[in-house]
A protein has these predicted regions:
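Short, well-formed alpha-helical segments that are part of the catalytic scaffolds
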Residues: 2-16, 30-33
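A short acidic (Asp/Glu
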Residues: 6-8, 33-36, 59, 98-105, ...
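Membrane-proximal basic amphipathic "stem/tether" segments
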Residues: 257-326
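Catalytic phosphate/metal-binding cores of nucleic-acid and nucleotide-processing enzymes, i.e., regions
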Residues: 24, 71-74, 105-112
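Hydrophobic/aromatic residues located in beta-strands of well-ordered beta-sheets
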Residues: 21-22, 46, 87
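Active-site-proximal specificity loops/subdomain of glycosyltransferases
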Residues: 25-81
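Catalytic core and acceptor-binding pocket of nucleotide-sugar-dependent glycosyltransferases
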Residues: 96-270
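Short beta-strand-to-loop acidic/aromatic patch adjacent to the donor-nucleotide binding site
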Residues: 84-97
Length: 326
């Protein structure tokens, strides 16, 4: 049976991007569903991949699951089928309600400008992509926040040159060892790399002489933080969902918009750009200072929380009640 929400999302994207090449890279379905989809949507390219399954592992009596490999396979196969120079990668449970993103793609890729930056400069040594990639900032973690994950772009939306997006997803599939307990004073997680981190770190590895630029969560130094920031500011530009007319309903309905204080905003990116690329003083607005105080309070909360999570029975109860991913 076809998901009605998916059909609604597909219709919205088609109406906002008329004349564009639309590719849906998904999993094998029954023949009658394939036939109906291709009959009703002759302007859409459907790719039905063989489902390679998820990765799972039991730790502390809890089963942890990641669909990382599914994302890699479906995204890569969709991108490799594109005949266009520019591509936008989104999830099938998300949609665009307008086409503002086209304006920003034109500004960045054709005019090489953004906001008040007339000509965007980059540090060649840290350029993984040929041009900047637009990154929806949901889950694009700021390592100075209360969720200090490095090399963590958001994986909900990428937009840029098709060749650059292919670089990001033309990587080896992950193995079960990616799931492991990682503990620090600041946080506890059960993945060496989150899906977002894995694709980015593996992508960088290809241009870094086969060496990992980052060894995994919570095992890092201040220089690793600097590298994470430099690689992000030279390859991605974060955009809020409203800026680009984009909606991923699951973030509010499933995650309850948690982590909003932990993600990169445009003013964060501008300050990284000033600090590393053009070497000018960082400027903090009143809003940024207020947000900094809120992040400090969240860090205190997480410190107390993580002290409690060191007890196994507390971890098991907490993850069963509250963890939404996997």
């Amino acid at each position: 049976m076809i998901d009605k929400k998916f059909i609604g999302n597909l219709d919205l994207v088609r109406s906002n991007f008329k004349g564009s090449q639309i590719i849906v890279s998904t999993w094998e379905v029954q023949d009658n569903i394939k036939t109906n989809l291709m009959k009703n949507y002759e302007d859409v390219i459907f790719i039905f991949n063989k489902d390679i399954g998820s990765i799972s592992k039991d730790i502390d009596g809890i089963k942890f699951v990641t669909n990382l490999n599914r994302m890699i396979v479906s995204t890569y196969n969709g991108l490799i089928s594109s005949s266009k120079k520019i591509s936008i990668k989104i999830r099938t449970d998300s949609y665009f309600y307008d086409k503002k993103i086209i304006y920003f793609l034109d500004e960045i890729l054709r005019k090489n400008k953004l906001d008040n930056v007339d000509v965007i400069s980059r540090m060649t040594k840290f350029c993984v992509f040929d041009r900047y990639v637009i990154n929806c900032n949901l889950f694009a973690r700021n390592p100075h926040s209360h969720l200090p994950f490095l090399f963590h772009p958001g994986d909900i939306l990428f937009a840029g040159l098709t060749s650059d997006l292919l670089k990001l997803f033309e990587i080896p599939l992950s193995k079960p060892k990616i799931i492991e307990k990682r503990i620090s004073l600041k946080n506890i997680c059960y993945m060496r790399y989150s899906p977002e981190q894995y694709i980015w770190v593996e992508c960088i590895k290809k241009i870094n002489g086969g060496r990992y630029v980052f060894e995994g969560n919570f095992n890092y130094t201040s220089s690793d933080i600097v590298k994470s920031e430099i690689y992000y500011v030279n390859n991605f530009i974060p955009f809020d969902t409203k800026e680009i007319g984009f909606c991923w309903p699951k973030h509010s309905k499933h995650y309850f918009n948690k982590g909003r204080l932990s993600i990169y905003r445009r003013d964060d990116w501008i300050n990284l750009y000033r600090k590393y690329v053009i070497h000018k003083p960082i400027e903090y607005s009143l809003g940024q200072r207020i947000r900094g105080l809120m992040i400090t309070s969240m860090k205190i909360y997480f410190l107390i929380r993580n002290m409690l999570l060191r007890f196994r029975f507390v971890r098991r109860l907490t993850y069963r009640l509250f963890v939404k991913r996997g």
